[in-house]
Structures are given as structure tokens and as C-alpha cells.
UniProtKB/Swiss-Prot annotation:
It is found in: Cell membrane. It comes from Escherichia coli (strain K12). This is Polyphosphate kinase. An intermediate of this reaction is the autophosphorylated ppk in which a phosphate is covalently linked to a histidine residue through a N-P bond. Its EC number is 2.7.4.1. GO terms for molecular function: ATP binding; diphosphotransferase activity; metal ion binding; phosphotransferase activity, phosphate group as acceptor; polyphosphate kinase activity; polyphosphate:AMP phosphotransferase activity; protein homodimerization activity. The active site is at H435 (phosphohistidine intermediate). It comes from the Bacteria. Belongs to the polyphosphate kinase 1 (PPK1) family. The gene is ppk. Keywords: ATP-binding, Cell membrane, Kinase, Magnesium, Membrane, Metal-binding, Nucleotide-binding, Phosphoprotein, Transferase. Catalyzes the reversible transfer of the terminal phosphate of ATP to form a long-chain polyphosphate (polyP). Can form linear polymers of orthophosphate with chain lengths up to 1000 or more. Can use GTP instead of ATP, but the efficiency of GTP is 5% that of ATP. Also exhibits several other enzymatic activities, which include: ATP synthesis from polyP in the presence of excess ADP, general nucleoside-diphosphate kinase activity, linear guanosine 5'-tetraphosphate (ppppG) synthesis and autophosphorylation. Changing H592Q: Slightly reduced enzyme activity.
């Protein structure tokens, strides 16, 4: 069998994942406004795809052509563009369908041509009061450098200023970062109707207010467009320059990085399209997409709650972990010292972690706090706690990952603020991104230092903890806390040798240990012992690990995969992956936690990890996976995994055809895993 048939290209697999998101927008069992929000998620995902995956492919094509190599990448480019075009057509159809369904529910997203006289007057006042100060036209002249001026993934209106036979062009930025994208209009009869208008259409309606008095014209026509840039960096790590200075420079470079996608309104005149293409230096390798009237659908993620309560998801109140509320514990440290605690977001509240760090910031017994941050919330209480701890005389070390894609600017801000507060801030070594989710609190108890550790699968972020599924393990077990201490030492001194007996740490030992554990399952299967591998991942694309799973399947090891995003492995290939079952779940929460389970001859090993099975995570990042040593917590994770694999509502097969077929229910009971997990955890947190 040829090599190309053993793996799905990661770019196509990623697009298949985003098509699953689009399926959620099409799913009529989802509430109407949630379906509209899934359109926003799809659009946001696609923007990131072009910034990262597509841009990387474009670079590969340019390099391969310079070297005179084969055309595989160009062929893949064609497949991508074809698949995106098909999905975009489905997207447009779904959007129109949802608009009709909204109207049936008395929610009207109207355009500038559908305004009543009263609404027209109201809009002109709104424009002058809230919007005009944010609008400055960019005139397109022969020397205008649009690549320099235009912002990445912002929607613009390209305006024709027509005077007789002369046409001038200008661009208007739609300032959705300063003014709400959705604006509620005064209702008309009947009063139950809820009219809204997009910011784009307010600008269309108010073109005269923008240009009148400055230009003579017979007509003004506006067409939407946006441009997506390559999000990668070209960092040259000079010894005398700090990483923060380099990152600030690279952020400036991103503002002028090469465009990789140009999306424009389908009825934009050809002459204007050509002017924009030329000004944006769009090459034959870039994606040029004629689209609808609106771009930046990512704002639809925040489509407002309007109308009846059943148009949005029924709330699932976040649950407190009952162990922290027991009367005998004076604080969170007492509870964790008694036994390990496992939190599973967003079912559990993130408040427990925030509260523990708040307590640590002023507890007289706390000596030191170490934490690494990758993506934190905009108004991060964790950052506040670290600053308060430093003010209270604690020794605070914060490892800031300046290379967290799309969060670099925020992390530079946090690093400066922490440094000013007296916190010891350190950065990752060049080329070694820190993706682990750790903190370590050192506390003086009865004359000895006791350490408390957090190992997680997700970021210390209050916002995403309400949307992403992730685990937090809180432990005072010295077997784990001593090794977390070693991880922080490794971060500060990445080239000193370090060993671990319990933790799986990239790039130190992850690949070796994963290979060894898969090989052990193969040996057990061959000897007739219990064997099996179950993985829950965001992405599975490392060919070495995929090949190891193929070898396991060929040896009779049952392999169960739950992969949300990219999966290069192809299940059910005869003689290669017959024993591999792979599914994906897309639902109201984003499945983000990573779990590795090995049967281990009947004594299961269960790991929680920050690392996907991607080459970068295994070999080029600092990642941490922890074993669950407490049998109670191990069983809890196994129960949750069982629920996920029993899903008969939101589970899809991963297959060679990228079909996204739903797993058939057959005669099994209806199980929507995320709701079932909520009920399971709720049952565990009942008072005894």
C-alpha cells in the first residue's frame, strides 16, 4: 500500500473538523441562536486555518518550486480550495436559512434598504453619537500601500466614489472592536418584533454622512472585503536582544506580513477587484474567494440573546467540588493535603483554582509560588493574585510564554505588568515553547516545606474554562510535586539534564515513554494478556506515533480514539488498522482535554496531558502528562471516557473519506455525552 494512502493530509483533516462545526449550525435539534453562533465558530476557525495552515502550505510551495521539486503541495492546495469553496457555499445557504428561521421567531436582521423612516432617523443619530469618531477613509491612490495599512481579518467596505466617468476608490474599516457588530433598532409594530442591524449596514446607510462635503460625487457604492495574513514569525534570535523585544518586533511584522487570503463581495466590480488584488500583492498561490455581503462572521460567536429562552442552550450551572466545602477544612490547602482533587471544566467551576491562588497570595505560611501562563483571561484574577503575592513578600516566579500564537501581545503586557510589581518573570528558551499547565505552591507546615501542585490540560483562563473541557489535578503527593518542581527547574535551565519517574515531560521523555507503552500493549496482546489503548486528543498527526498505533492494531491491540480536530491516522484499513475505532465529538463545549489510557495487562495507566500527538508537542515544546495515582480519580476519568464513547447524538466517525458520518444509534439509548457527563459529575458532588 502506498504511503499516501496511510495518512490523511493534516490540512484536509482540519477542514473536515471545521465541517463538523458547520454540521452543528445545520443541526435543527440545536437552539436557533446557538446555530447562528456555530456559524461564527466556523468562520473564526477558517480565519485561523488560513493564517497558519494555509500560510505554511504556501511557503512550502514557494520553497519546493525554488528547489524544482514535485507538485504534491500544489495539488493539495487545489484540494483545499475546492473543499473550502464547497463548505462556504453550504455556509451561505445555512445563513439564509437561519435568517428565515429567525424571522419566524420575530428576530429580524435587516439591511439598510429595509429601514423605516423612524429607524433611519435613529440610525443617523446613532452614527453621529457613537460611530463617526471611529471612521477615517483610506483613499486608494497610486502610492497607497494597502499591505501596510490594512488590518488582518478586519472587514472593510471598498467604496466607489463616482463622478461622471471618473471613479475613485476608498476603504472604510468596520470598527467592530470599538462598536458592537449587532445593533438593536427601535421596534416597529407589532412590538414583539426585535429588529437588529449589522454595523456594516449602518456604514452603508451613512456613506453620505462620511463623504459629503469632502468629495463631489454622483453616486457612492460600497462592497465588503477582508484580507487574512500569514501569522507565522520570522524571528532571528540575536544574543544581545531580549525575546520580548524580538516578539514585539514580530508582532509589528505580522501587521505587514504577506496576505494569504482575499475575500470580497461577489458583485464587486471587476475593476475594483483588480485594484485591490494588485494593491494587496495577491499571488497565484493565495486564496481568492468571492463571497457574500458580510465577512468576519466570527463576530456571530457573540450573537446576542434575543427572543425566547428556548432559542439558546439551557444553562448548566457550574458545579462546586464538594470536597472543598467540607467543614473540617480551614482552607484549600487542608483539602488538597488530605487527598488529591480532580476538577473537570466546564462542569466544575474554575473558582476553586482562582480561590486557591488568592489564598496563597496572602497566606503567611506560603513561601513561594511558581506558575506558567500561556493564555490568560483579559482581566485575569490569576495575574492579580501573583501581583498581590509579590506585594505580600512571597517569592513569585511566573513563566510567560511570549510565543503563544495570537496571544503574544497580551502576554507581553502581562510580563511587563508582573515585572513592575516585583514578580520574577522568565521566558521560554528560543525554539522551546512552554505549553504545560502548572503551578507549584511551597508552604511552611510544622517546620517543613510542603508543596502543592496543579497539573492541567487547559489554560489558566477564566473565560475558556466556561467553554472548553479540561482537567485540573490538584495534589500534595510528593511523588508528583517533587517532579513538578523539577519541571520548573528545567524551564529555568533547559539544557541541564533532568530525569522523571512519574511525569511524562516533553521534550525530555514523552516520545520514548509513549513508544514503550504502545510496545508493551503489543507484547501483552501477543502473550494473550489484556491489552488496549484509548486516547482523547485534539490532534493526532505525528507519523511516528501513528505508525506505532498501526503496529498495535496489526498485533491485535484494540485502539479507541476520540480526536476532536486533525487526525492523520486512517481507521479500518485492512491488515493495518482493523482494530482502530476513531470518533470525534463536536457539541456545545469544545473538547480540549487530552487523556492517554493504556490497559497495561489489566492494571490500567491513565494520564492527563497538555500535549497532543503532534511532532511539535512531543519534541519541541515543554509539555507535561501526569499519571493518576489515586484509584478514585483514575476511575472517574475512565467513567467519563466511557460516557464519551457511548455518545449516540454528537459523535461522528473519522474515516478515510472524511465523511463525518454520525455514529448510528441503532437500538441503543440516546446519549448526548456532554449532558450525561454533567449529570454524572453532579451526582458525585451531592452531600453525603
Amino acid at each position: 500500500m502506498g504511503q499516501e494512502k496511510l495518512y490523511i493530509e493534516k490540512e484536509l483533516s482540519w477542514l473536515s473538523f471545521n465541517e463538523r462545526v458547520l454540521q452543528e449550525a445545520a443541526d435543527k435539534s440545536n437552539p436557533l441562536i446557538e446555530r447562528m453562533r456555530f456559524l461564527g465558530i466556523y468562520s473564526n476557525n477558517l480565519d485561523e486555518f488560513y493564517k497558519v495552515r494555509f500560510a505554511e502550505l504556501k511557503r512550502r510551495i514557494i520553497i519546493s518550486e525554488e528547489q524544482g521539486s514535485n507538485s504534491h503541495s500544489r495539488h493539495l492546495l487545489g484540494k483545499i480550495q475546492s473543499r473550502v469553496l464547497k463548505a462556504d457555499q453550504e455556509f451561505d445557504g445555512l445563513y439564509n436559512e437561519l435568517l428565515l428561521e429567525m424571522a419566524r421567531n420575530q428576530i429580524f436582521l435587516i439591511n439598510e434598504r429595509q429601514l423605516s423612516v423612524n429607524q433611519q432617523n435613529w440610525l443617523r443619530h446613532y452614527f453621529k453619537q457613537y460611530l463617526r469618531q471611529h471612521i477615517t477613509p483610506i483613499l486608494i491612490n497610486p502610492d497607497t500601500d494597502l499591505v501596510q495599512f490594512l488590518k488582518d481579518d478586519y472587514t472593510y467596505l471598498a467604496v466607489e466614489i463616482i463622478r461622471g466617468d471618473t471613479i475613485r476608490y476608498a476603504l472604510l474599516e468596520i470598527p467592530s472592536d470599538k462598536v458592537p457588530r449587532f445593533v438593536n433598532l427601535p421596534p416597529e409594530a407589532p412590538r414583539r418584533r426585535k429588529p437588529m442591524i449589522l454595523l456594516d449596514n449602518i456604514l452603508r446607510y451613512c456613506l453620505d454622512d462620511i463623504f459629503k462635503g469632502f468629495f463631489d460625487y454622483d453616486a457612492l457604492n460600497a462592497y465588503s472585503m477582508k484580507m487574512t495574513r500569514d501569522a507565522e514569525y520570522d524571528l532571528v534570535h540575536e544574543m544581545e536582544a531580549s525575546l520580548m523585544e524580538l516578539m514585539s518586533s514580530s508582532l509589528k511584522q505580522r501587521l505587514t506580513a504577506e496576505p494569504v487570503r482575499f475575500v470580497y463581495q461577489r458583485d464587486m466590480p471587476n475593476a475594483l477587484v483588480e485594484v485591490l488584488r494588485e494593491k494587496l500583492t495577491i499571488s497565484r498561490y493565495d486564496s481568492i474567494v468571492p463571497g457574500g455581503r458580510y465577512h468576519n462572521f466570527k463576530d456571530f460567536i457573540n450573537f446576542p440573546n434575543v427572543g425566547k429562552a428556548n432559542l439558546v442552550n439551557k444553562p448548566l450551572p457550574r458545579l462546586r467540588h464538594i470536597w472543598f466545602d467540607k467543614a473540617q477544612f480551614r482552607n484549600g490547602f487542608d483539602a488538597i493535603r488530605e487527598r488529591d482533587v480532580l476538577l473537570y471544566y466546564p462542569y466544575h467551576t474554575f473558582e476553586h483554582v482562582l480561590e486557591l491562588l488568592r489564598q496563597a497570595s496572602f497566606d503567611p505560611s506560603v513561601l513561594a509560588i511558581k506558575i506558567n501562563i500561556y493564555r490568560v483571561a483579559k482581566d485575569s484574577r490569576i495575574i492579580d493574585s501573583m501581583i498581590h503575592a509579590a506585594h505580600n513578600g512571597k517569592k513569585v516566579t511566573v513563566v510567560v510564554e511570549l510565543q503563544a500564537r495570537f496571544d503574544e501581545e497580551a502576554n507581553i503586557h502581562w510580563a511587563k505588568r508582573l515585572t513592575e510589581a516585583g514578580v520574577h518573570v522568565i521566558f521560554s528558551a528560543p525554539g522551546l515553547k512552554i505549553h504545560a499547565k502548572l503551578f507549584l505552591i511551597s508552604r511552611k507546615e510544622n517546620g517543613e516545606v510542603v508543596r502543592y501542585a496543579h497539573i492541567g490540560t487547559g489554560n489558566f483562563n477564566e473565560k475558556t474554562a466556561r467553554l472548553y473541557t479540561d482537567y485540573s489535578l490538584l495534589t500534595a503527593d510528593a511523588r508528583i510535586t517533587n517532579e513538578v518542581r523539577r519541571v520548573f527547574n528545567f524551564i529555568e535551565n533547559p539544557y541541564r539534564p533532568v530525569t522523571f519517574d512519574y511525569l511524562m515531560v516533553s521534550p525530555q521523555n514523552s516520545r520514548r515513554l509513549l513508544y514503550e507503552m504502545v510496545d508493551r500493549e503489543i507484547a501483552n496482546a501477543q502473550q494473550g494478556l489484556p491489552s488496549g489503548i484509548t486516547l482523547k486528543l485534539n490532534n493526532l498527526v505525528d507519523k511516528g506515533l501513528v505508525d506505532r498505533l498501526y503496529a498495535a492494531s496489526s498485533s491485535g491491540v484494540p485502539v479507541n480514539l476520540l480526536v476532536r480536530g486533525m487526525c492523520s491516522l486512517i481507521p479500518n484499513l485492512e491488515g493495518i488498522s482493523d482494530n482502530i475505532r476513531a470518533i470525534s465529538i463536536v457539541d456545545r463545549y469544545l473538547e480540549h482535554d487530552r487523556v492517554y489510557i493504556f490497559e497495561n495487562g489489566g492494571d490500567k495507566k491513565v494520564y492527563l496531558s497538555s500535549a497532543d500527538w503532534m511532532t511539535r508537542n512531543i519534541d519541541y515544546r515543554i509539555e507535561v502528562a501526569t499519571p493518576l495515582l489515586d484509584p478514585r480519580l483514575k476511575q472517574r476519568v475512565l467513567d467519563i471516557i466511557d460516557i464519551l464513547f457511548s455518545d449516540t447524538v454528537k459523535a461522528r466517525y473519522i474515516d478515510k473519506e472524511l465523511s463525518n458520518r454520525y455514529v448510528p444509534r441503532g437500538n441503543r439509548r440516546k446519549v448526548r455525552a456532554q449532558l450525561a457527563i454533567y449529570d454524572y459529575i453532579k451526582s458525585l458532588e451531592q452531600p453525603e
